[in-house]
Amino acid sequence: MSTISIVGAGNVARGIATRSVAAGYGVQLLVRDEAKGKALASQLGNGVTVGTIGGPITGDIVVLAIPYSAVSEVIRPLGSLSGRTLIDATNPINAESTGLATTPGTSGAEAIAALAPEAHVVKAFNTVFAGNMVAGQKNGQPLDLFIAADDEAARTAVIAFGEKTGFRVIDTGALSQSATLEALAWLHMQLQFTRGTNFASAIAIID
């Protein structure tokens, strides 16, 4: 059985872990607050384990499911990510929550790749709201999962992971496309307030 190591114990971590457990993956939560991690693991059941950041990583894939503002504090303490597939599920929202912290033409995912050059970074899960991930569908339809990556093996691994966990994976191309995916996620967040959808809407490509 493959294992997924998820960094974080918040709503996004819960969503990805829920889908992973349902698909038969082993799940390891890597956390700074061990009590919070254990509480989530208890709710998820199915042998979900909890480790602290800096401890052994058991997952074949590592997922960053923490606020973007915490990434720089967490990446180095995580330890060696050499050769690992690292999913960036973050959105680089600025401290004032008025927009993206990145400059035009750059992305949080590429900044993470620079912080962890030995890892193979894949952008994924940042455009799907956590509640929808827990539900695993929207109006009876699979959720669209947009991904971007440079490393082909990592791309293939995340496509397989996404499909096995019930998503319809849409490959957008190179990691540089993360800038577009992060802008799309920010727009989707803003629409929650103008449309009153309470973070329950989903982005979908209608073929």
Task: List the model feature ranges, each with a label.
Residues 90-137:
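Rossmann-fold NAD(P)-binding glycine/threonine-rich loop
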Residues 5-6, 64, 147:
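Hydrophobic Val/Ile/Leu positions in short beta-strands of Rossmann-like dinucleotide-binding domains
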Residues 45-47, 51-96:
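Rossmann-like NAD(P)-binding element
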Residues 26, 47-49, 85, 120, ...:
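Conserved beta-strand segments of alpha/beta enzyme cores
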Residues 1-39, 43:
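NAD(P)+-binding Rossmann beta1-loop-alpha1 motif at the extreme N-terminus of oxidoreductases
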Residues 144-207:
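Active-site-lining helix/loop region of Rossmann-like oxidoreductase modules
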Residues 2-3, 85, 144:
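Residues that mark the start of a beta-strand
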